[in-house]
Amino acid sequence: MKRRELIRLLVGAAAGAWAFPASTQQRPRIGILHSGFPKRTAIHLLFEALGKLGYGDTDIDLLSGEGDPVRLKSLVNQFGARRPVVIIAITTPAAIALKEATLKIPVVFAFVSDPVGLGIVESFAHPSGDFTGVAYSEAGIGGKWLELLVDAIAGMTRVAVLWSASKASIARLESIRTSAATRGIEIFSRKLSGLEDLASAFDDAARAKAQAAIFMTDNTMFGHRKLVAELALTHSLPTIHSFRLEVQDGSLMSYGPTDDEILRRVAALADKILRGARPSELPVEYPTKFELIINLKTAKALGLTIPESFLLRADQVIE
């Protein structure tokens, strides 16, 4: 079965519980571009959201870059030939690749941390051009990560921040520094040059006597989240991350937007475009729903006792 046919069936299955308005118009074609390996649960959430909006019998092309920039560029060119009515770009590299291609096709992006700084849109209120979407989070989330570590780990005075170079990461690092200054927390900052730099970054954090770490995940590191969790455990370093999956794969905790809210809002923006709106007329949105996930098994492996009052704040505790 061809991938497009399979995706159409999945959309229909996800939307099967709802009735869709009859239409004699030609089915619109929707493109979905992911730079890496899309999470099955996330894709299902997106299909479900599109199904609820009436796109249960729509041609959908789901293309995955599988972490290969050359492949990603080739897939963008395929969209140029197929000419979908709208493309949903999942992850920053996917959005950038589409921006650089100048296809003149409306794009709705998801999980992009700094769309203005990256030049994808001119501003949040007035995106301009063919792009709009849902940004991942504001810079202030960095301060929230530090706050959660302070509340979870008694007597903590030194925190490592492991980050990949991007304007979004730099803004979050400044938010962390500001929060740390008010709490008397010392920050050890370590920029990651790439996957080959990961182990040495944890070594440096341990030598700096960090008692915990904030790990700013990029697309490459997210694909190696189990390795990140293993390195953190090896170095006895509690870590906080952005994504639920990082905690499910062994890291201590995460705080970030929920996939379902982001993807529902992305689907809603795509629906508006399919109904005639221009991306430039649709302000870029921020998520409003965040979740705290804690891996208690990892806490025990680290010899860490999480206060009961903190556990009660969690949206999910993995035993």
Language-model regions, residue ranges each:
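Short hydrophobic alpha-helices and adjacent helix-cap/hinge residues
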Residues: 1-319
